[in-house]
Amino acid sequence: MADIKHLIANNKEWAEQQVKKDPDFFKRLVGQQSPQYLWIGCSDSRVPANEIVGMAPGELFVHRNVANQVIQTDFNCLSVIQFAIEALKVRHILVVGHYGCGGVKAALESKPHGLVDHWLYPIRDVYREHAEELEQLGETEQIDRLCELNVIEQVKNLAKTNMVQEAWDKGESLTIHGWVYRLDNGLVNDMNVSVSSREGMEQVYHVYHQKLPKGG
């Protein structure tokens, strides 16, 4: 345990600093959480959800996986979405990828990666659908463009889930957004695919099938 003692020390220092800045900080956290936002992002350790959008603990409900995917057979992700919509009553769902994503890069490689290859298969489908455009780009630009297309694909997948469809049918206020985060400057690039109704899906498909300017 010697190699992680510094983490315990860091935790103690962090807790003390929080109380010093705000004596009621932890008292508020004990109550029921009521975030207005669900963040579905990549597991990459360089993409800290709360910090990126300047939100404190309790203000952002977070789910992360490799390459920020929403897959209809992933009960972990689907359970998070259902809980966020039905129990927490979130008003916005943010699908957030990041440029230079290792998962997206791995999906483009021909060498095997073991179990993760099954997880990345949907990204390869996105590549095949946009191969004509992507094959004209250099390696870095190709990865970054696929990161953008993957986010838009996940917005589409999320909008098709029963939980989202039912919320819209009930007239609930729920908007899905697609962003891509830049590691080199800390800014998010809005893919302009926000959708808040079944009818709004037409705009998402329109953006998905036209060439977008690269972020930044």
PLM regions and their residue ranges:
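Divalent-metal-activated hydrolytic enzyme cores
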Residues: 1-35, 67-91, 102-216
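N-terminal short beta-loop-beta anion/metal-coordinating cradle
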Residues: 18-59
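Short beta-strand segments
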Residues: 40-42, 64, 94-98, 177-182
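A glycine-rich, hydrophobic loop/mini-helix early in the fold
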Residues: 48-76
